[in-house]
């Protein structure tokens, strides 16, 4: 939006969720940007057990699809297609409406590739996820965050690979800067370190990272602390510390930020 301010952008949001105006206040108040905030009406509590015709879910999809059909957009971008399990998030649409091309960002298909770990343990989520996979295959195009996710989508989804584009979500060095003097992180105390930024869910493989780090020669561990940034809940921190005990990793070499 900052690179192409001459275009018109509509932030199409869900009235059943939190108001996002404060999160985008800078962009909305910037008169150089042509950004419109729109809350699409939905029928509350869309996740009732019945989702067929005339259900709250069905009616909300009709409202959403109608709104999308009249905003005269050139393209609709969905930033996360797998949201909406047991909450009021709504990303589905009805193709009987005259809609512009619809594309979605795709991050991974890990639950599909590891169904025993993610899907088979929860039949309700499995049904939700597989329906999303089917819907995803009916979109006009996909934007993958990496070449790996592009290949994964081409392999497992029923969509022409030529409509899957790798947009790469690598970090932009212009967004980062050196630690400021008033930072509460004591870099001298850390010394040299290995940094892990992520959650504790199985797909992140933090358990194996702890195991691998603990298996390093002691002189390397002493010289390179392992720094973990979550944030983590109290329960997750306890779990990580249990892994450290399992692999005989002294707590002084692991730093939680």
What are these regions (language model features)?
Residues 1-257:
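Carbohydrate transferase catalytic cores enriched for Leloir-type hexosyltransferases
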């Amino acid at each position: 939006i900052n690179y192409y301010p001459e275009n018109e952008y509509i932030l199409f949001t869900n009235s059943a969720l939190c108001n996002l105006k404060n999160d985008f206040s800078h962009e909305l108040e910037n008169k150089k940007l042509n950004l419109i905030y729109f809350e699409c009406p939905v029928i509350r509590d869309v996740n009732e057990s019945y989702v067929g015709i005339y259900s709250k879910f069905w009616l909300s999809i009709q409202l959403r699809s109608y709104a999308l059909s009249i905003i005269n957009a050139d393209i609709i971008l969905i930033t996360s297609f797998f949201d909406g399990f047991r909450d009021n998030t709504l990303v589905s649409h009805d193709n009987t409406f005259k809609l512009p091309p619809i594309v979605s960002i795709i991050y991974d298909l890990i639950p599909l590739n590891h169904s025993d770990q993610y899907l088979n343990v929860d039949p309700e989520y499995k049904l939700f996820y597989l329906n999303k996979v089917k819907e995803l295959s009916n979109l006009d195009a996909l934007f993958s965050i990496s070449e790996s996710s592009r290949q994964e989508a081409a392999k497992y989804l029923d969509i022409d690979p030529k409509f899957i584009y790798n947009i790469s979500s690598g970090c932009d060095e212009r967004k980062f800067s050196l630690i400021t003097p008033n930072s509460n992180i004591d870099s001298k105390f850390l010394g040299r370190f290995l940094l892990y930024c992520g959650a504790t869910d199985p797909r992140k493989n933090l358990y194996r990272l702890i195991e691998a780090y603990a298996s390093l020669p002691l002189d390397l561990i002493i010289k390179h602390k392992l720094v973990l940034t979550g944030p983590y809940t109290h329960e997750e921190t306890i779990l990580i510390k249990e892994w450290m005990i399992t692999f005989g990793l002294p707590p002084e070499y692991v730093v939680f930020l």
